[in-house]
């Protein structure tokens, strides 16, 4: 394991060991208090661009489930199709894992996804700093200066992370586990016609995808509705729907002016 250091914007330094992919990264440092669910948290699009600190001391003891896709295109055990967090920071990483559904260790998964992981960090002290001063920018650097290059800490709020994680097409999900995709260039009138051909009895919920988790879509489908998922900046005015759902997501909402304008017109 290589030595690695987390450096915060205020100059605070935390030394640890690497157990994931070895590359320097920078991002907004945040903490997560969940006792379990690191596969779901890491694949949550809301964590895009962030260095995730887990406050629960022991992490990795139940490994990582397989990545499988359901017939409707949703990930079975994850919140999206890939890891979105820039890195994971833990106090004590367990190299041994045991779970009926595990196929690999957390460290192996991180290396395959090219995401750094740090263990041996005093996450209690780090969390106290973040709690008192609020989230702040930070960077992870390795013991070899050559590896770190010209790593700089950008302004997290200046990057439109929502645009990076939002869907790139219109997707219709049905309660029966099927889905259909439509190009963004399809005229609204034609799209309305296509959407009404399957089951006109179902209520339609329009989902503005600002970084939605798969579990949110599943919860909506359990209400026996059709979910129409559109990109964050898609002008959905003219589409026929019965309910409007705006998902959460990463980054600063100020970068999502197009979504605000579309929602304002709809309201």
Describe each model-derived feature in a short phrase:
Residues 234-240:
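Short amphipathic alpha-helix with an adjacent loop that forms part of the alpha/beta core around
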């Amino acid at each position: 394991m290589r030595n690695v250091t987390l450096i915060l914007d205020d100059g605070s330094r935390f030394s640890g060991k690497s157990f994931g992919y070895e590359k320097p990264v920078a991002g907004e440092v945040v903490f997560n208090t969940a006792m379990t669910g690191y596969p779901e948290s890491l694949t949550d699009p809301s964590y895009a661009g962030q260095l995730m600190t887990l406050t629960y001391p022991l992490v990795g003891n139940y490994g990582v489930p397989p990545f499988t896709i359901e017939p409707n295109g949703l990930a079975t055990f994850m919140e999206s199709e890939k890891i979105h967090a820039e890195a994971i920071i833990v106090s004590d990483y367990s190299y041994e894992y045991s779970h009926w559904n595990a196929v690999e260790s957390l460290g192996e998964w991180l290396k395959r996804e090219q995401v750094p992981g740090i263990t041996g960090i005093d996450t209690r002290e780090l969390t106290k700093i973040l709690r008192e001063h609020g989230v702040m920018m930070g960077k992870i650097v390795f013991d070899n200066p050559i590896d770190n290059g010209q790593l700089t800490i950008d302004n997290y709020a200046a990057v439109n992370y929502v645009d990076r994680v939002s869907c790139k097409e219109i997707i219709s999900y049905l309660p029966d586990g099927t889905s259909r995709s439509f190009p963004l260039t399809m005229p609204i009138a034609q799209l309305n016609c296509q959407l009404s051909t399957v089951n006109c009895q179902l209520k339609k919920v329009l989902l503005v995808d600002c970084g939605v988790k798969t579990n949110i879509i599943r919860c909506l489908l359990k209400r026996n509705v059709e979910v129409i998922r559109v990109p964050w900046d898609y002008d959905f005015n003219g589409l026929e729907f019965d309910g409007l759902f705006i998902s959460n997501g990463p980054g600063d909402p100020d970068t999502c002016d197009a979504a605000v304008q579309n929602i304002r017109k709809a309201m």
